[in-house]
Amino acid sequence: MANSQPKASQQRQAKVMTAAAGSASRVAVPLLLCALLVPGGAYVLDDSDGLGREFDGIGAVSGGGATSRLLVNYPEPYRSEILDYLFKPNFGASLHILKVEIGGDGQTTDGTEPSHMHYELDENYFRGYEWWLMKEAKKRNPDIILMGLPWSFPGWLGKGFSWPYVNLQLTAYYVVRWILGAKHYHDLDIDYIGIWNERPFDANYIKELRKMLDYQGLQRVRIIASDNLWEPISSSLLLDQELWKVVDVIGAHYPGTYTVWNAKMSGKKLWSSEDFSTINSNVGAGCWSRILNQNYINGNMTSTIAWNLVASYYEELPYGRSGLMTAQEPWSGHYVVASPIWVSAHTTQFTQPGWYYLKTVGHLEKGGSYVALTDGLGNLTIIIETMSHQHSMCIRPYLPYYNVSHQLATFTLKGSLREIQELQVWYTKLGTPQQRLHFKQLDTLWLLDGSGSFTLELEEDEIFTLTTLTTGRKGSYPPPPSSKPFPTNYKDDFNVEYPLFSEAPNFADQTGVFEYYMNNEDREHRFTLRQVLNQRPITWAADASSTISVIGDHHWTNMTVQCDVYIETPRSGGVFIAGRVNKGGILIRSATGVFFWIFANGSYRVTADLGGWITYASGHADVTAKRWYTLTLGIKGYFAFGMLNGTILWKNVRVKYPGHGWAAIGTHTFEFAQFDNFRVEAAR
């Protein structure tokens, strides 16, 4: 092919123009004469009258919950490549902020994340994967800002109530221990700490938290509140001077680019501390592009944080693929660098926390928006977006209709900015597949005639970044392996003496916490997987009454699931294995499938749901606590059978809905139990 440059790229080279004199070989291609007939607007970028608000950075959330669960299982080099796309400066998303869940043992959207203190006298700062993720982010960007926020809390904090504010000092102690543990065990400095995600705040608790932070020498840790709506936190700050003094940032979720009067009057930094939450298609990318600009223009928000960082959880869980990129196949190594990565780069690669917005930002006459930021040292970055309504709808809130049309936009630099003579140009086109182009560097734009003016031809669903910085880069790696379904023959004996992570690969805990465990006296089952909660957490979502961890392929139909099980609780204890489990995450209480239970009282049950409301079969089983048993569950078509220690216990049980789903293990209640030698043979 004589010219391999993408057609869209060729077209865009003709979209940037300047009337400035200069080397003809280095200016952008002039516009066609017919383009002069397109309506246009004039916009001034000026720092003469001072600057706007300080920019605090763009980031993403890991957790809320278990959204990075599968990432840790990826083999190298693919795991490191994914992390580079997220965190490496001037490579991909180049995020400024990483916000993580402070695991509290409860279901928090797509799974549970373990607490550092399951019980009052228990402390372990190596559970889960958020510590690891923060360290990996810091390796790539030592300046990345770290935030922690609880969604759920371990049950012991509630003293019998599902409420974290029963003992304010105890809850503050619990959170501060997490911050201290991050530093002591992982050399991680937490910069911001939150209160309780999307749940009520207690003003006295916030004051107590500040007091305890200061007592522990953590004056540098700032408090963000309340990670919910703008109200009532904003009015509370205005009415309570002591509370106003201890809150550094008002963080709102899914604000729709707008704030409220009380928040503005507070004088506090305003953040969209959780936003996006949209499938990472080009529509999701359009959503992300629009709110990155307009959260500041419309709402004075100086930071926007996406939920979630990377879609590393089974896609059929709630909000599948709602990360900046997708990495949900550690068994194959396949991942997808989705378009929100490159939308992020338009801002993150050319700004830093501590820069300032210009006062002269706003909306374009024919739809779209522009912001400009400076470091005060002569550098300038301008980000322009023209996202159409159709291609930028976020999952929430409702987006009123608006129109974007073809237009010319003339920008004039004034004040100290007029000294700028050249701008690097980066371009993205979203919208239809035939037009898409992600983060393409165009020709340098020269401003040599002293006017400080340039004109852009803008169409729908475009992003331009014009910047004095020359460090931008579209990083890349060779294509990852092809996508493959979860292996249909899978087994895990949990024989890991020194596990790198507390959880077994690919198991996704949906209620309860399942961790590697070592028996000191049982040689045959020395290394096992153990459900470690004996008390219901202070929940954020509707956790099930039974604990459960799912694994495999949601499309599995026929399967044989086998596992050695050990009930630790006499008389009332029970465990199960299951197949065709159809739901998880915040919907786990209503999960259906085929559940094969045995109980320490010498009985068994086969149910159609996790809650045990529909019973297929039941009867006597030679089972007691404190002994190992091998359970086998077979499902084929409309029939199922169950075996205990290799002997048929029940058979020819007719099963109906659902027709497919994951395999699973779990316990009857929040109780200790162990699992070993798990295996599944399945078919899609």
Curated annotation (Swiss-Prot):
Binding positions (substrate): T109, W151, N197, R396
Disulfide bond annotation, renumbered to this chain: C287-C394
Gene Ontology process terms (BP): galactosylceramide catabolic process; myelination
Keyword Glycoprotein: yes
Family annotation (InterPro entries): Aldolase_TIM, GH59_C, GH59_cat, Glyco_hydro_59, Glyco_hydro_59_dom, Glycoside_hydrolase_SF
Keywords: Disulfide bond, Glycoprotein, Glycosidase, Hydrolase, Lipid degradation, Lipid metabolism, Lysosome, Signal, Sphingolipid metabolism
Stored PANTHER family: GALACTOCEREBROSIDASE (PTHR15172:SF1)
General function of this protein: Hydrolyzes the galactose ester bonds of glycolipids such as galactosylceramide and galactosylsphingosine. Enzyme with very low activity responsible for the lysosomal catabolism of galactosylceramide, a major lipid in myelin, kidney and epithelial cells of small intestine and colon.
Linked pathology: Defects in Galc are the cause of the 'twitcher' phenotype; an autosomal recessive leukodystrophy similar to the human disease (Krabbe disease). This deficiency results in the insufficient catabolism of several galactolipids that are important in the production of normal myelin.
Protein name: Galactocerebrosidase
Source organism of this protein record: Mus musculus
Gene name tied to this protein: Galc
